[in-house]
Amino acid sequence: MLIDGKQMHIQITKGDIGRYVILPGDPARCEKIAQYFDDPKQIAHNREYTLWTGSLDGVPVAVCSTGIGGPSAAIAMEELVECGADTFIRVGTSGGIVDKVKGGDIVIATGAIRQEGTSREYLPIEFPAVADFSVVSALHEAAQALGFPYHTGVIQSKDSFYGEIRPAQMPIADELTAKWKAWKAALMIVAQVLHVRCGAVLNVLWNADNDDAPAIPPDATERGVKAAVEAIRVLIREDSKA
């Protein structure tokens, strides 16, 4: 929706950004992420949406915060697509569920359990929330190149950050890698509706079921960002061959 020639919420227009966008939740992280770009500059700030642009390998890229939760994340993706974006990597944090996922690891999401509300406004619950294969592959290549400990798997998206896992839901945990990523399922579903690419990489802060988890390395919260940036470089190279 345009108001005075700009998208209503993110306050930019077509031509302001390129194809590739990193999506953190926290507006304060945008400037930090943009420092990995060449020629970074802030181009918009409105409500929870802060937007910086720059380039990687000579190709325009951007970072846009989404705030907390599925509704605001869906708005960001909808409006970014209207402005020309078609490839998204969500960068965030999570807790681990299975014992092998430790604090300091990163998780590359292949799909998400839709236990939130936003995605249901787009597609019925039977429709799976899955990440784009090319983005997952690029993140996998990036994590290997950077030497980060990583895992791939399904994550759990819920609307309640503090909500307890009910006993009846516990069997789900055996098949999950990470949980408490409130809006990833929403982004995956919106991306499929809009026919764009979306993936996610999460920094694991702790293991929810392991009190003896090792101390988190100082650079742990930046590992997901570095993996996302390197994955975009991979996608740029692959897309240039198409």
What label would you give each PLM region?
Residues 1-137:
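Metabolite-binding pocket within alpha/beta catalytic cores that recognizes anionic/polar moieties
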Residues 26, 63, 92, 155, ...:
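Buried hydrophobic positions in well-ordered alpha/beta secondary-structure cores of metabolic enzymes
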Residues 40-45, 147-154, 235-242:
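Flexible, glycine/charged-enriched surface loops at secondary-structure junctions
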Residues 82, 162-167, 171-173, 201, ...:
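Expand to "…catalyze enediolate/carbanion chemistry for C-C bond making/breaking, isomerization
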Residues 130-183:
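Active-site rim beta-loop-alpha module in soluble metabolic enzymes
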Residues 138-146, 190, 227-238:
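Generic non-transmembrane alpha-helical segments
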Residues 186-217:
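Zn-dependent metallopeptidase/amidohydrolase metal-coordination segment
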Residues 208-242:
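His/Asp/Glu-rich mid-to-C-terminal helical/loop segments that flank catalytic regions of hydrolases
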